[in-house]
Amino acid sequence: MKALGYWLMVVGSLRLASVWFGFFNIWALRLAVFSQTTMSEVHGRTFGVWTLLTCTLCFLCAFNLENKPLYLATFLSFIYALGHFLTEYLFYQTMTIANLSTVGFFAGTSIVWMLLEWNSLEQPHSKLS
């Protein structure tokens, strides 16, 4: 397995921990992510379901890095997550810069790494003699 695959499993595991907070410990989720606003339990469960989906993408992609559609969906999940959290910080002020920095580190690293690895997904073309 490539190093990117291991990285995606680490990120997927961290996302899985966030799923727990979304479903069962809304207080911890509020402190860890959305510290500038109130959250209801339905917000936590919605966050948990979204995060479970992105966690699943990370694990599937980690074991199938050569699958371009899956790779692209996983890559876009990082773009969407970073965009969402940037919006929460910049426009709605529901996050602190410290919380955004944590999300930004994992999403940003994943985005850059996946971009760098994108061209290595090309399958060599067989030569016709």
Swiss-Prot record:
Q: Name one GO biological process term.
A: regulation of auxin polar transport
> TM spans, by residue?
4-24, 46-66, 71-91, 96-116
User: What family is this protein classified in?
Assistant: Belongs to the ERG28 family.
How is this protein annotated for GO cellular component?
Answer: endoplasmic reticulum; endoplasmic reticulum membrane
Q: Which UniProt keywords apply?
A: Endoplasmic reticulum, Lipid biosynthesis, Lipid metabolism, Membrane, Steroid biosynthesis, Steroid metabolism, Sterol biosynthesis, Sterol metabolism, Transmembrane, Transmembrane helix
Q: Does the keyword Transmembrane apply?
A: yes
Q: Which InterPro entries match?
A: Erg28 (IPR005352)
Q: Which GO molecular function entries does the Swiss-Prot or TrEMBL record give?
A: protein-macromolecule adaptor activity
Name of the protein described by the UniProt record? Ergosterol biosynthetic protein 28
What membrane topology is given?
Answer: Multi-pass membrane protein
PANTHER family, per database record: ERGOSTEROL BIOSYNTHETIC PROTEIN 28 HOMOLOG (PTHR15451:SF19), ERGOSTEROL BIOSYNTHETIC PROTEIN 28-RELATED (PTHR15451)
* Protein's cellular compartments: Endoplasmic reticulum membrane
Species this protein is from: Arabidopsis thaliana (Mouse-ear cress)
